Amino acid sequence: LLIPQEFRTADNGAEHGVFCFFALADDCLEAGGDRLMAEYIARIEALPFGSDKRTALEETFYAGQRPLSYDGGGRITLPESLCQDAGLGEDVVIVGLGPRFQIWDRARWNARRDARRALARQVMNGEAV
């Protein structure tokens, strides 16, 4: 999977590769560099050690996370296990989210996109959500 240049920068800590894992909030993969990892680690470590919430995050995030290096052309190879977890087929789309990005099955993303755009419009128009 070719990762666009804007996601392979020193600014987000992804100049040499990305960390990829099943997204905690959506049925897709999430990926990013050291900056994204630091944000997740800080959120996990802010919770009391051994708490059910922290353990759930640790099990979901750390256990499923894979560091992936780029080849000479800026591509990564997604592990089959991650693809299965996210229900990815042959046709995927990369959705940029600032310092991170998501990898969606194209059909699932297309079904979600219109609802997300409508919500974004409500937020921008100051409507109660």
Residue spans for each PLM region:
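Active-site micro-motifs of SAM-dependent methyltransferase domains
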Residues: 9, 84, 111
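Residue-level signal for well-ordered alpha-helical positions
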Residues: 14, 43, 89, 115-116
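Intrinsic, low-complexity N-terminal interaction/targeting segments
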Residues: 43-58, 65
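Acidic (E/D-rich), amphipathic helical modules within compact regulatory domains
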Residues: 2-46
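A short beta-strand-loop micro-motif that forms or neighbors metal/cofactor-
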Residues: 12-29, 87-104, 121
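Beta-rich strand-turn-strand
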Residues: 66-89
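Short, Lys/Arg-rich amphipathic alpha-helical interaction segments
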Residues: 107-129
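Short, structured motif recognition centered on aromatic/hydrophobic residues
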Residues: 1-3, 31, 74-78, 82, ...
